[in-house]
Design a protein with these regions (language model features):
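N-terminal and secondary-structure boundary signal
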Residues: 1-256
Length: 256
């Protein structure tokens, strides 16, 4: 049996942390305080269980998270033409590197439940990259269509997000890093990575198959290297490139 707790004002509560209950409205308030506003384009990386004890069913919880994001940037998932902002959520499919198959409708996201939920909503577009794909909805969704020959190259979705002034949000934690760092690594041509070609097929929204080849700037296994998220976070804070907010015991980071 599903149930939701209510606060004194009759608002259904979303999660509990440190003996305090929080609603969708609390999340909206934090995001707005962080500078997220109507018309923004946002890319949301999440670790939702970092928020605390969930007080709703999984689908109700995920729906409220998406609803909060929509509310902040001016998006109505049922009225795409009226949207003012854009929401972008990772739905990466690393399995393509082994299986050689990326099915835009059926390949499950391997990076969290929010993207897996979001990509199945009506009118949500899933990008073409067979490894680093995103679910996208909103005013600027059309800008992210098209195939890039390199996961992090000049035609990639990461470059497009930079060009379109997307704000990057880490929801639930700031300790897991952000995939954008790999775009920077390719841009700088760091010596501990190299291009590796992956071959396979993409099955699009209309079940049409096409062969593809994509370059992935992968780590050199014979060259010691380690991504230090604490160091990266330290630099971002020092350079005032990230703002960190708290909701319960969880952190919410905003860059851009």
């Amino acid at each position: 049996m599903s149930f939701c707790l209510l606060n004194d004002n009759g608002v259904k509560m979303l999660f509990e942390s440190n003996h305090q209950k929080y609603s969708k409205n609390d999340l909206v308030a934090v995001l707005k305080n962080a500078g997220i506003c109507s018309g923004d384009s946002i890319c949301v990386h999440s670790e939702l269980f970092g928020l605390g004890k969930i007080l709703k069913t999984k689908d109700e919880f995920l729906n409220d998270i998406i609803s909060a994001l929509c509310s902040c940037v001016g998006v109505d998932i049922h009225k795409p033409k009226s949207s003012l902002g854009t929401i972008i959520v990772p739905t990466f499919t690393y399995d393509f590197c082994k299986s050689g198959v990326y099915d835009k409708k059926n390949s499950r996201s391997e990076v969290g439940i929010l993207g897996e939920y979001f990509r199945k909503l009506p009118n949500v577009y899933r990008s073409d990259d067979p490894i680093f794909n995103f679910a996208i909805f909103g005013k600027d969704a059309g800008k992210y269509k098209g195939f890039s020959l390199s996961c992090f190259g000049e035609q990639s979705i990461f470059k497009k997000m930079i060009d379109n002034n997307v704000k990057f949000i880490t929801l639930g934690t700031t300790d897991t890093g952000c995939t954008l760092v790999h775009y920077c690594e390719e841009l700088l041509q760091v010596p501990y990575r190299y291009y590796k070609d992956f071959f396979g097929k993409i099955i699009d929204e209309n079940s049409i198959q096409k062969e593809c080849k994509i370059k992935y700037f992968v780590r050199k296994l014979d060259m010691p290297s380690m991504l230090s998220v604490p160091k990266m976070k330290e630099i971002l804070i020092k350079d005032k490139a990230i703002k960190i907010y708290t909701l319960g015991s969880a952190q919410i980071g905003v860059m851009g």
